[in-house]
Amino acid sequence: MLSLREQQLQVWFKNRRAKLARERRLQQQPQRVPGQRGRGARAAPLVPAASASAPQRGPSGILPAAEPTICSLHQAWGGPGCRAQKGIPAALSPGPGPIPAPIPGPAQIPGPLPGSIPGPIPGPAQIPSPIPAPIPGPISGPVQIPGPFRGPIPGPISGPAPIPGPISGPFSGPNPGPIPGPNPGPIPGPISGPIPGPISVPIPGPIPGPISGPISGPNPGPIPGPIPGPISGPNPGPIPGPISGPNPGLIPGPIPGPISGPGPIIGPIPSPAQIPGPGRLQGPGPILSPGRMRSPGSLPGLAPILGPGSGPGSGSVPAPIPGPGSLPAPAPLWPQSPDASDFLPDTQLFPHFTELLLPLDPLEGSSVSTMTSQYQEGDDSMGKKHSGSQPQEEGGSVNENHSGPRLLLDL
């Protein structure tokens, strides 16, 4: 008694033989040519189709037995899985041949290309892997290149080609045009060559080398090196260091610090402060005129109070007075007229006095109180000449408590 597996194999072979016999009959039937009728149509030659691909029969006229394997019922009736496992030839199919029609869709190249591509690629090409060889021809369409290039590209690229990553290598050629975008960060390296154009942005750090061109904007920081050219803009901050070289031109602004080097002062010198009060002279010391008297050498113990000078302005710091020993001959301060001699003293009668009275308004007051002042006597001849006209002397001092007109009348 046969088992179930053997029965299934017998049924499968029976069906297979019947199918092959039916296909053979269809292939052996003559193909009727249109236009021929009657017995001439049967005389046409037979055209066997795929007769070489038919399975060869064994010596006994039956098909060779297959290897005994376990298959299910639906696989035994011609299932594709069982046919692939048993090695049974599948349905008849045409042999391999060339495909004349081109592929209409985009070409996808999965692996690297061993050789160069001679012709251009008309459609968009997607190249996922790097290309070991250079591309000799131009690429007409847009190219998306995700990976890096191992070799250089000799030909030009006509279409736009975006570069996703940064460029690590330096540029060998010159840069013909300026960079259109702003520079967000500082320049890390030094600039070896000169800068041809003006710099619109402020420079945060010091500049070690000299600057050949003018600077248009303000300079926030100090400049350690020499500046050969003029500075067109204003300088907001003072110059911290001394000026070593000569200054050929004028300085338009005020100088905050002292000037150490010698040089002429072009601007006006401010005059000392005026003595307050409408017409009275206040203070314990003698009254001097800075434009007339040059030195308080004969007044050792008293601090002089300077009167209004002849300068155009007024300041709070008086001009320096040279030391003793270089006193020129005193010049007359007032005109020698009969009207002025009644109110003003004659300086020729008092050559040893180093204190002088300022001209006052006669209508404002006639009494002038002066303090005691010391003076040094000259030679005996000058003392004898004016001994009859001097008032009372006590220890080299002169006490004048008279009024101005009375003193002049006594003289």
From Swiss-Prot:
Source species of the chain: Homo sapiens
InterPro entries from the UniProt entry: HD (IPR001356), Homeodomain-like_sf (IPR009057)
Family of the protein in this entry: Belongs to the paired homeobox family.
Listed Low complexity bias regions: 27-55, 295-307
Chain's role: Transcription factor expressed after fertilization required for zygotic genome activation (ZGA), a critical event in early embryonic development during which the developmental control passes from maternally provided mRNAs to the expression of the zygotic genome after fertilization. Binds and activates expression of key ZGA marker genes, such as NANOGNB, ZSCAN4, DUXB, KLF5 and DPPA3. Binds to regulatory DNA sequences containing a 5'-TAATCC-3' sequence motif.
CDD domains: homeodomain (cd00086)
Residues annotated to bind DNA: 3-24
Region Disordered, residue ranges: 20-63, 88-246, 286-340, 363-411
Main subcellular location of this protein, as a coarse class: nucleus
Protein name (database record): Tetra-peptide repeat homeobox protein 1
A cellular component term, taken from the record's GO annotations: chromatin
GO molecular function: DNA binding; DNA-binding transcription factor activity, RNA polymerase II-specific
Biological process per Gene Ontology, one example term: maternal-to-zygotic transition of gene expression
Biased composition (Pro residues): 95-139, 149-246, 319-335
Subcellular location as annotated: Nucleus
Keywords carried by this UniProt record: Developmental protein, DNA-binding, Homeobox, Nucleus, Transcription, Transcription regulation
Ranges of biased composition (kind: Polar residues): 366-376, 388-402
PROSITE patterns documented for this protein: HOMEOBOX_2
Domain of life: Eukaryota
